[in-house]
Amino acid sequence: MSNQELLQLAVNAVDDKKAEQVVALNMKGISLIADFFLICHGNSEKQVQAIAHELKKVAQEQGIEIKRLEGYEQARWVLIDLGDVVVHVFHKDERAYYNLEKLWGDAPTVELEGVIS
């Protein structure tokens, strides 16, 4: 599966659970961690967990190894490492506080209209 297809899979999974303000950053040449960061948020701990759970389920169904999953129990900032795509699922309040989009402001955003199937 290509990185772009992996990103599309992640976008569709978080969208299925009504994640808000879904933003993808192209990290190629900027970070050694991943090619893409996908950032989104939920409005409650339950929604954050539902988004993370859906992504985990879809990844496992596709045979994609989840390299790391952190923060699920607290549901304030869940990080799901899919290898070349790292997904950050925030609680709304934490997203505003950490503001990863500003922190990685030199990373171009990916137009999601072309990614969502």
UniProtKB/Swiss-Prot annotation:
Protein name: Ribosomal silencing factor RsfS
Transmembrane segments: none
Organism lineage: Bacteria, Bacillati, Bacillota, Bacilli, Bacillales
A matching Pfam family: RsfS
MF (Gene Ontology): ribosomal large subunit binding
Domain of life the protein comes from: Bacteria
Record has Hydrolase as a keyword: no
Self-association and partners: Interacts with ribosomal protein uL14 (rplN).
The organism of origin for this protein: Halalkalibacterium halodurans (strain ATCC BAA-125 / DSM 18197 / FERM 7344 / JCM 9153 / C-125) (Bacillus halodurans)
